A protein has these predicted regions:
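Structured alpha-helical
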Residues: 1-125
Length: 125
């Protein structure tokens, strides 16, 4: 059991990566939604899902595509939802494969962000 303020450890990185979420709805129907990460942390992510959101408390399969177009698959619990019609989001807490997440995504995030900003410098015409 963790208190809300203890759950989030470490930095969160603002990084948009393609994601796919799969979960079962209340009727047992498999739901699939695609979107983007808003930010990632050491053990979770905030994701933007434009069409549909899973329920709070549900367990989802989260697939994130890294910069080399490889899929990183983890399991996560939906902690909260932002039901903003223009920008719906789900806050996810990993429940499996946390070390894989950190090694393949979180630990590489600062370098990836720096590379994105470096390429932006050349866009100022």
């Amino acid at each position: 059991f963790m208190l809300a303020d203890e759950r989030r450890r470490g930095d969160r990185y603002v990084l948009a990566m393609p994601v796919r979420l799969e979960w079962k709805d209340g009727n047992g129907q498999t739901m699939v939604e695609e979107g983007l990460t808003e930010n990632i942390g050491a053990s979770g992510a905030l994701v933007h899902l434009p069409r549909g959101l899973p329920e709070v408390g549900s367990i989802v399969n989260l697939y994130v595509i890294d910069e080399k177009n490889r899929e990183v698959a983890v399991e996560a619990e939906v902690l909260r939802l932002e039901r903003n019609a223009a920008h719906p989001q789900a806050a996810l807490q990993l429940v499996s494969s946390i070390e894989k997440w950190q090694k393949k995504l979180y630990d590489k995030a600062p370098k990836r962000i720096a590379a994105l900003h470096a390429s932006d410098e050349y866009d100022d015409f």
